A protein has these predicted regions:
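Aromatic-lined substrate-binding rim segments of carbohydrate-active enzymes
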Residues: 1-40, 124-154, 220
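Aromatic- and acidic-residue-enriched segments that line the glycan-binding/catalytic groove
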Residues: 1-12, 43-72, 109-128, 173-183
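The substrate-binding groove and active-site-proximal loops of carbohydrate-active enzymes
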Residues: 3-17, 71-86, 128-140, 182-183, ...
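Substrate-binding cleft/loops of secretory-pathway carbohydrate-active enzymes
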Residues: 47, 154, 159-207, 212-227, ...
Length: 350
């Protein structure tokens, strides 16, 4: 059913058949931007029992109450059920088929915590696992792997990535972990084995949320960024660093996030790591409302970042010479970019 955040009432469709995602895709492409659909796979509500009860009767959580687990007042789909994982994968497939999106991105929420009440599912499906933690990680791994395979079967050009919490595991917990201590280890806290996703090549890119400053005593930004750079090395998986723009601009001169100094130092460090392909900034509104950050990014990314890139979807009447040297025959040694392929198809239909 339709989200309440679109029309104010869950299950109520926008007027006149308006499809907001189709509109966003159209406008993004017109500006030369890619649009990646952001998916939060297992979370149903964050507003407690009242929000859950307000869900419409045709919501999957109401149609399949056996899929639902309550945890600390909020409600989640149970990752340990094969039918839940299949439902999420089919949702991603619908996005890939129905919309001209450029990618699908999974958020960092998988299991909400170790006290998740999934004992019955573990008893039914956990045979072959020595502990519930390994079984939970395998459930998430199955979703990550299968979802990528299925959307790439529909559109091999889709970019598929995930933004896990910045620390996979401390070295004191796992020998392959980072030299960090005492923080949130996603391997254990949300059962997200993000290192495995990279090493197995199940995703196209990883975007760890490294929301700490350089010099943090237990989770130093530089330490974590270098760990991720080393992790992706040689895998073919791209690395984009999730930046904490929302913390920048603190008015307290004693704060490590005072002004834009912390972000500036992080960008400089990223530039020294060849594996870092770029940054993702959380979040746009806070960045747009911070003139100092905007000025910093204009300098860091170049003035061209202030202007829309040329659209990948070309008006072929204005780009008659775009495909150079093509005589209508395609040879084994030839190759086409996505934009060229779209342009050629457009020529066949006008």
């Amino acid at each position: 059913p339709w989200s309440k955040y679109l029309t104010g009432a869950q299950g109520t469709a926008p007027k006149n058949g308006f499809d907001p995602l189709a509109y966003w895709v159209e406008r993004a492409h017109a500006l030369g931007l890619e649009l990646h659909a952001w998916v939060n796979p297992f979370r149903i509500t964050k507003g407690g029992a009242a929000e859950f009860q307000a869900l419409t009767a045709d919501h999957p959580a109401k149609l399949h109450p056996d899929w639902v687990v309550e945890y600390e007042g909020d409600y989640y789909f149970n990752p340990g059920l094969p039918e839940v994982r299949e439902y999420i994968v089919r949702g991603a497939e619908e996005l890939a088929r129905k919309y001209d999106i450029d990618g699908i991105h999974l958020d960092d929420y998988f299991y909400p915590g170790s006290g998740f009440a999934d004992g019955a599912a573990y008893a039914k499906y956990g045979k072959g696992f020595s502990n519930i933690g390994d079984w939970r990680r395998d459930n998430v791994n199955q979703l990550v792997k299968t979802l990528g395979e299925r959307i790439h079967a529909i559109d091999p050009g889709l970019s598929y990535g995930i933004s896990p919490s910045g620390v996979w595991a401390d070295k004191s917990s796992l020998p392959q972990g980072s030299n960090t201590t005492g923080g949130y280890e996603s391997y254990y806290a949300s059962y997200a084995d993000s290192r495995k996703w990279v090493k197995e090549g199940w995703i196209d890119y990883i975007c760890p949320q490294i929301y700490w400053y350089i010099g943090h005593k237990s989770m130093d930004y530089a330490t974590v960024a270098r760990w991720w750079a080393d992790t992706v090395k040689g895998t073919g998986v791209s690395l984009y660093i999730g930046m904490a723009d929302y913390l920048a601009g603190n008015s307290d001169p004693k704060s490590p996030w005072y002004g834009t100094t912390a972000i500036e130092r992080q960008l400089a460090l990223n530039d020294t790591l060849p594996q870092v392909a770029g940054e993702a900034h959380f979040r746009y509104r806070l960045m747009a409302e911070n003139p100092e950050l905007l000025a910093l990014y204009a300098e860091a990314y170049g003035e061209e970042s202030q202007e829309p890139a040329e659209p990948a979807y070309l008006n072929t009447r204005e780009h008659d010479a775009y495909i150079q040297g093509n005589d209508g025959r395609f040879r084994p040694e030839d190759s086409l970019s996505r934009a060229e392929a779209v342009a050629m198809l457009a020529r066949l239909t006008v």
